[in-house]
Amino acid sequence: MSTRTLVATLALVAVTLGAAATAFAGDKDLVLRRLADRTESQASPGHFNADPDLPAFRALSKDLGVVMGPKFLAPAETLGQAGFDVGFEFSFTSVNTNADHWRALESQDAGAGFATGQLHVRKGLPFSLELGGSLTHLFESEMFAVGTELKFSLNEGFFYLPDFAVRGTFNTVVGASDLNLATTGFDVSISKSFGVVGVVNITPYAGYNYLVIFSSSRLLDVAPEDPSPPTINEATGDLEFQPEFVFDTQQQQLNRFFGGTRFLFGVLALTLEANISENAQTYSGRVGFDF
């Protein structure tokens, strides 16, 4: 299977699973209309106007961008032209669970944080390049993220110098009926491997990630129980009530720092990692096979 086919397959699986899960909303699914206050219209009693809370939407998007954004879980070295790696990753993201914007969750409670599971595949290419694809699921929800990445190692295996790499990423979320969310960014990382008594290869690594989060909403309604369409006051030309609203596209930047260690036993690779940003901390583990 070619790498292009592999990434396309991950995207197809995510869309299929997201469509199949629409009838099973979980505690971590979104009800974005809660991010607007509804006030009764003075011009049309019994009907409501929407007062959207944009700062809450931006804060929610920023936190979910970290939760569903790219994970690292690999040293700076590439796999080599013939290399192939597949693994399963588990991550837990700790956020400010008392923040007001979590009222937009189905349960209206973020609990202890957010857990995700991820299938991550990487393929080595010529010229110290590496292409990857990922499929991430947010537990207790119907949300998935499809990701792709391209890494270039500027130095690997050269004398005693550490390996150094640059990676670009793009992730998009599917399965959220109210939300459009995507992330893009780049990271730089360094690592150095060493063997221990011929049994295990240990590779500590660290790096920096610049992440850009794009978010917007679809059409929302603070009074879904009221089927009445908005009406126009003939005298003024103004709407008498307007329960529908949209959060326009928002762009936010985030700096993240990460570090971890990979333990390689033959083809079996175990990796532990932590990454930290201003609004969240993510702790991850990975079990993979490096061929």
Model-predicted regions and their roles:
Residues 97-108, 205-291:
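Outer membrane beta-barrel transmembrane domains
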Residues 1-10:
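Bacterial N-terminal signal peptides that target proteins for export
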Residues 25-157:
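Transmembrane beta-barrel domains of Gram-negative outer membranes and organellar outer membranes
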Residues 127-131, 157-162, 198, 202, ...:
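Repeated loop/turn-to-beta-strand initiation elements of outer-membrane beta-barrel proteins
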Residues 17-25:
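Sec/Tat signal peptide C-region and signal peptidase I cleavage site
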Residues 74-75, 86-88, 119-125, 148-152, ...:
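Residues on the lipid-exposed face of transmembrane beta-strands in outer-membrane beta-barrel proteins
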Residues 90-94, 135-141, 152-154, 168-174, ...:
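Transmembrane beta-strands of outer-membrane beta-barrel pores
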Residues 80-82, 112-117, 142-146, 180-186, ...:
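Residues that define the transmembrane beta-barrel architecture of outer-membrane proteins
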